[in-house]
């Protein structure tokens, strides 16, 4: 009887030590299968995220993922700002690269107008995977060469239609200029 009690005491001590080690490390690791179950995705989706370097994991005998990294991945999974192309940020605003939506917001024009400008070559953009990436210099060029000319053209049309109109009457918002184009 005494041996059994001693063994159970040692088991409890071992469990407490193991829990203390986990707390000291501050990291709880999960497998690909556990990560997939936690986020209601397939194991393949987790594996692909690891291979694309969107999810940090380490491989000893099996893949192990830190729960903190898994939560970071979940938060940024669908974020276009964090999108990577061949290991680099796709829309790195610090380097002057912007998405179509960002360009549309900057110029005050509809998103479809930016897509049309890139397809027709009026605004040069680069395809990286499925996304268009537009540089700051190209945005500035498009704004000065194309948008400013359209503004002047619209103002002249108003002046011809209404000769008594003052320049203040011919002021338009950025989006009104491009309706019905």
From Swiss-Prot:
Pfam families: HTH_17 (PF12728). Belongs to the EUO family. This is Early upstream open reading frame. It comes from Chlamydia caviae (strain ATCC VR-813 / DSM 19441 / 03DC25 / GPIC).
């Amino acid at each position: 009887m005494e041996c059994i009690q001693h063994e159970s005491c040692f088991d409890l001590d071992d469990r407490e030590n193991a829990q203390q080690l986990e707390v000291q490390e501050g990291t709880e690791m999960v497998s690909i299968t556990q990560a997939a179950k936690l986020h209601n995705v397939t194991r393949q989706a987790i594996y692909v995220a690891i291979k694309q370097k969107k999810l940090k994991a380490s491989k000893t005998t099996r893949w192990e993922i830190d729960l903190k990294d898994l939560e970071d991945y979940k938060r940024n999974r669908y974020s276009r700002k964090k999108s990577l192309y061949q290991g680099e940020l796709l829309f790195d605003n610090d380097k002057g690269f912007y998405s179509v939506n960002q360009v549309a917001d900057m110029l005050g024009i509809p998103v479809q107008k930016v897509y049309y400008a890139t397809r027709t070559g009026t605004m040069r953009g680069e395809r990286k995977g499925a996304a268009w990436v537009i540089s700051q210099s190209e945005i500035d060029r498009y704004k000065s060469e194309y948008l400013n000319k359209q503004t002047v053209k619209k103002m002249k049309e108003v002046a011809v239609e209404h000769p008594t109109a003052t320049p203040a009457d011919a002021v338009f918002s950025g989006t009104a200029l491009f309706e019905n184009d």
